[in-house]
Amino acid sequence: MIRMLVLIVVTAASPVYQRCFQDGAIVKQNPSKEAVTEVCLKDDVSMIKTEARYVKNATGVFSNNVAIRKWLVSDWHDCRPKKIVGGHINVIEVGDDLSLHTESYVCSADCTIGVDKETAQVRLQTDTTNHFEIAGTTVKSGWFKSTTYITLDQTCEHLKVSCAPKSVQFHACFNQHMSCVRFLHRTILPGSIANSICQNIEIIILVTLTLLIFILLSILSKTYICYLLMPIFIPIAYMYGVIYNKSCKKCKLCGLVYHPFTECGTHCVCGARYDTSDRMKLHRASGLCPGYKSLRAARVMCKSKGPASILSIITAVLVLTFVTPINSMVLGESKETFELEELPDDMLEMALRINSYYFTCILNYAVSWGLIIAGLLVGLIFKKYQHRFLNIYAMYCEECNMYHDKSGLKRHGDFTNKCRQCTCGQYEDATGLITHRKTYNCLVQYKAKWMMNFLIIYIFLILIKDSAIVGQATGTDFTTCLETESINWNCTGPFLNLGNCQKQQKKEPYTNIATQLKGLKAISVLDIPIITSIPDDIAGALRYIEEKEDFHVQLTTEYAMLSKYCDYYTQFSDNSGYSQTTWRVYLRSHDFEACILYPNQHFCKCVKNGEKCSSSNWDFANGMKNYYSGKQAKFDKDLNLALTALHHAFRGTSSAYIAAMLSKKSNDDLIAYTNKIKAKFPGNALLKAIIDYIAYMKGLPEMANFKYDEFWDELLYKPNPAKASNLARGKESSYNFKLAISSKSIKTCKNVKDVACLSPRSGAIYSSIIACGEPNGPSVYRKPSGGVFQSSTDRSIYCLLDSHCLEEFEAISQEELDAVKKSKCWEIEYPDVRPLQESDGAKSCRMKDSGNCNVATNRWPVMQCENDKFYYSELQKDYDKTQDIGHYCLSPGCTTIRYPINPKHISNCNWQVSRSSIAKIDVHNVEDIEQYKKAITQKLQTSLSLFKYAKTKNLPHIRPIYKYITMKETETAEGIESAYIESEVPALAGTSVGFKINSKEGKHLLDVIAYVKSASYSSVYAKLYSTGPTSGINTKHDELCTGPCPANINHQVGWLTFARERTSSWGCEEFGCLAVSDGCVFGSCQDIIKEELSVYRKETEEVTNVELCLTFSDKTYCTNLNPVTPIITDLFEVQFKTVETYSLPRIVAVQNHEIKIGQINDLGVYSKGCGNVQKVNGTVYGNGVPRFDYLCHLASRKEVIVRKCFDNDYQACKFLQSPASYRLEEDSGTVTIIDYKKILGTIKMKAILGDVKYKTFADSVDITAEGSCAGCINCFQNIHCELTLHTTIEASCPIKSSCTVFHDRILVTPNEHKYALKIVCTEKPGNTLTIKVCNTRIEASMALVDAKPIIELAPVDQTAYIREKDERCKTWMCRVRDEGLQVILEPFKNLFGSYIGIFYTFIISIIALLVIIYVLLPICFKLRDTLRKHDDAYKREMKIR
């Protein structure tokens, strides 16, 4: 017993086991029929889990779903976090239904972002707990306090640094490639040694490669394989043998080559061996020596280490000359429309007018071309048969071979009274001295006369055509009908005069129709609302018209409808048309009783099949005259069928007129009306048959007892509203609307009343206004569509759209106000008043977005809640401690109820959540050199701002290679007028070319530098969705004890459903359930993803942008060009000569500020691969087949375990590629992808220099000069100098300095005094820098910065120093030349200091002495001996003679 008690005590003392974590606080509970599964997740600041605790009551079993959170970063609230899209703190939030989703937050505490350029570290500083994230080429994140540093180690860093609410994106490059440094940092070497090794890596590689080749050759020399090198050494040995035999002095003792420092050898060059020098000399002098053996020497070289070492050096140099360094290789290289709603209103109106004139233009076009073709045909016929045409005016006389005018012509046999007198005016005398010959001029006057008549007729036809086109429509008699008291037959729809009908009227909205009718004075301004309310479709318009209970109102609406569809009744002229479909279908779908008995009668065939309609009148008059006798019911049915068909054919006023005739039993008037319709449309056979049938039925005796259908009574007009005051209030109006006003800019309304007025034209009730204020002088305004709201500050005041009184009441026009004053009006209670209730407001909410917005005319801090309502909130950072993460107070301390703001009032929002701003590098161009000095000497090494001297800002980092170019244009006595130069530059970012501009005589005049500052193509991408790995699964499930699973399982948007039947069994059922192999477990699920990757789709076509700059010594200017449009200015003429076309991928992914391309799913596509789970607007979408299991508990509900919901193939995203040449610029909601490493083509440039009067330049010039320089040594920006030169004449001056100057020659003019130079110094020049301009020596003051930055910041689309260096120096030997040899000599320079010159002189002297002794002296001695031999030979020859 004691043991049992001890066991119970121990068991009770042990803590209760809890899954996931112990303790924690409940953040939300949700009793529901559906249970959630147990989920345990971790975010950046906490852990959260969900549990389902079942509760049973009288109505069933319910689940108390609970969410519990435990903080891991307990003080994260100190950084004042706020929600923002793309934030770097991931927090799991709990929804009202306990569904979990991931949200992004950032801290609101202040944070300073900087970059230490001397240590290549990002510096972050804050006063409290804060969080940072670095994304891009370096990815790091974490929490910190005070100050932290993040070291950069990539050669070129493309980064987005985020700390608190600030984000900055920039591009930074080191002054050397960092792959070597990163590799050595992983070893035991100290950082300084690693940096030194990498700085000298080129010479180290050269020496190492030389040693490796030497070792290889030394090993090969031990074997016969070394003789493979003989083809290399044989030419060398042969050349040496030639030089040996012919050019070297011989030793007097042995006969070999002179060897002052060694003894005579025993081996001859031919291979023979002698013991003494005398025998060797005898062998050489007697001619027995065959000479130098090149093959033997080559074999010796193959085995010797000396030639091997020389060969290794040469081979290493050759290899490194043609091999590109790995560090400098670049990996991965290898339209405007407008929517209709975007157009302004005047353009839309213009489009409508164009449509209205379209038919007229087509008609005019057809008639004009017809006239043209007719004129051409007449011209061709006239040309071919012109004599027949001209025969009208003149005749040809064969007797006298002349043409005679027919006017006054008289014949005398074969002769006429005008013989010997031609139409051309020439006479022929009887003597035959003047003989006439028929020529072209004889009939020219008649041709002209005929052409004149033809042109007159042609112009007359054109005038008739144009006059017919511009002819206006006739007037309308609609106004006459409005003046009648009651309806007449000629005031019904078919008989209204609509004037000229144009088909484009159908495209006009009823608003335009109302405007047209008001312009014709046909309606009042108070009638416009009833016309604009007509539905656009014909069926709806006819129903709307028939609903009108007053003749004048119905006539007005019908006339408006017929004005729009002006061919509605003209379609009745024949047997088809869109307006006849309804009544013809109605007839064919209903049968006449008589036709059932007599189907072959002509009338019945006409009604059913459209046959025999012309003989239908005598048919039923003879064949069916006895059918209706004693059959009143059948008579009534058939006549009602015919009248109903007529009703469907003629709706509106026609049907109302027929209804009035039927109610009055005015059968004669009815038949007269139908006969008028038949007379108006004589070609409509079926309509004629129906009307004749109605007339026939009227003549039968059964007509006296005819009962028409009840619907005709609904078409009768009601009494006039003016005579029935109960339509308004039942008493006289207490408001004096004669004194009504309608003021503008009124936002509040007291005593709001509805107003009804009668139109003076149609009598329609005009109820589009409300009245405010006192009855004696009410203010009337347009009736709001959304009602009025009670003000939140004064309950007696009413506002529009919301309770804040921000919207102005719309004043009515003066025309409407005048009509109201002249009309009879009543006030009635306004029904659409929304009183203020506390339930409409809120003290706190889960924030969706926050920021500052334009609210009406004010700038308010606004918070958008998760229910998409907007509230005024001045804090936006105060948490509601009674709620979970994400709930913010709308007022300080959540004490005041705030009411929502209508979204219409909100505009131009600077959202902090959905549209976070990302800063860029600030580039400041400083115009004055003194200000530039001040800017760079402040040592702002941690600033993200760049300061550039304006006059040299467009120069490259490295001095370009110059080429000579000659000026072109007209040469004069003074020089060249309008001079220019032409050249071509590759469109590659960072390319620079220097031009040494010469005159045509070859005289160097000045230097100009062309620099491609940026060259890229880019596109803008819009975000589609986010994706990421699945971190958990949201689940809701339920179970049934018995029965099948539901056919349709309720689920939320984006959730997948699952179900399994026959889940109830013994030991696996809830309490009270007794079932075996029955029941169901079902539910829905959704993945919880961690957003790691965002997918974007291309929204714009590729845009190519190139910025080309020209820099002189006194000015600089740039131009932006594209492949389409050439640039022509006073300074530049630039265009693309060749264009390379590239394209960016359609869909890209962005992860950690890095672009990834590959197989990525589009929005709404869920195929296997990256992006088949998509989060859009806070909802996760995907597809798949959920997999789940359940655990059974005795007398309890099952524990559902969902193992998989969506098919998430996020692992495929890890195989996406990251192009090295792409750069990324993030903006609010979009990104811009830029490729800047492609050659976009070739730019043809024409630089206009103006008038260069170089022939007047002086050779010597007096210059008053001073200079000022600022910059740094061995840095990115180098030294910038401003020279102030004063001279009275123009001159071309060379520039000389101890440092490297970018411009070697400048033009000096009297009008320009400020000149700028960029200078590169490798050594500190002292307090002044000596610059020589022409013959003037300038001691420019120096302001040097001691900082040694190793990293350079640059805008995203511009190149850095390391990039230009790689482009300039692409081989290892180039690196050795620029850096290696200098590095070798650097230790000696540091050792000897200022005496380095003496040391270099000593070394050079020793080398020169050795060359003299071993090279020059033997050659000189050989030359001396040769000259002596020639002299001895000369003396011997002279003795012989």
UniProtKB/Swiss-Prot annotation:
It holds the Pfam family Bunya_G1. It comes from the Viruses. Glycans are attached at N57, N490, N1177. Residues 1-13 form the signal peptide. The record marks A473, T474 as: Cleavage. InterPro entries: Bunya_G1, Bunya_G2, Bunya_nonstruc_pro_NSm, M_poly_OrthobunV. Residues 222-305, 387-452, 1417-1441 are cytoplasmic. Keywords: Fusion of virus membrane with host endosomal membrane, Fusion of virus membrane with host membrane, Glycoprotein, Host endoplasmic reticulum, Host Golgi apparatus, Host membrane, Host-virus interaction, Membrane, Signal, Transmembrane, Transmembrane helix, Viral attachment to host cell, Viral penetration into host cytoplasm, Virion, Virus entry into host cell. One of its GO terms (biological process) is virion attachment to host cell. GO terms for cellular component: host cell endoplasmic reticulum membrane; host cell Golgi membrane; membrane; virion membrane. The chain crosses the membrane at residues 201-221, 306-326, 366-386, 453-473, 1396-1416. Residues 14-200, 327-365, 474-1395 are lumenal. Specific enzymatic cleavages in vivo yield mature proteins including nonstructural protein NSm, glycoprotein C, and glycoprotein N. Belongs to the orthobunyavirus envelope glycoprotein family. Glycoprotein C and Glycoprotein N interact with each other and are present at the surface of the virion. They are able to attach the virion to a cell receptor and to promote fusion of membranes after endocytosis of the virion. Glycoprotein C and Glycoprotein N interact with each other. This is Envelopment polyprotein. It comes from Bunyavirus La Crosse. The lineage of its organism: Viruses, Riboviria, Orthornavirae, Negarnaviricota, Polyploviricotina.
